């Protein structure tokens, strides 16, 4: 073996040893002691790293709960059981709240809303909107390309025959990723105890809505006038229901000429 090769190996080994020593020293000097409670809380979280809590992942959520005062029930995937365990660990009392599920505020679909053209591109609502605007006559409604389904890592959403996403509540963790993925904001959270819903998001004038959709809200205010609880307000041609006031009497459902309000 030549002396040049031996010297090269020796220099390389020396450099490796020196760098290793420097790394060990640096790890000691710059060591940051973490709060052991963060690891304890993180071990209780499901590890889905879905971001439904609003943080980067489960580790960030645990840190926020321990050091930033985030609620112990921040994790929607873990639900009440995980929140209860974290609360016991941190000495906080936890009360169970009603779970929310994604809800589709549109019923135009393939049957009731005008389709402007056949789309044969990427099956993604955001991409379709960027390339050629809405394929539906109503620019507020569901495009039916399944971006929300693709965003759900728990397999809780599927596309129904009418072109709308269907939620499997048994699999849904209420992480909210499907809601965030919808470019038209058609999906929103709703509780099972909230019985009456306006199945429309259009703020267009009534005549424009009727021109493209058979079941869209036209802002006629009949529901607002009929509601005995004063739970409905029509703003910018769209009815909105105050769930705190709503008694689910069904008066608004019966009087709506467009059948845009549903009693579940």
From Swiss-Prot:
Enzyme class: translocase
Translocase found in the keyword field: yes
Membrane topology, from the record: Single-pass membrane protein
Subcellular location: Cell membrane
Gene name linked to the record: rnfB
Ranges where the 4Fe-4S ferredoxin-type domain occurs: 127-162, 163-192, 207-236, 237-264
Chief site of localization: membrane
GO molecular function, one term: 4 iron, 4 sulfur cluster binding
PANTHER family named in the record: ION-TRANSLOCATING OXIDOREDUCTASE COMPLEX SUBUNIT B (PTHR43560:SF1)
Annotated source species: Methanosarcina acetivorans (strain ATCC 35395 / DSM 2834 / JCM 12185 / C2A)
Name used for this protein in its record: Ion-translocating oxidoreductase complex subunit B
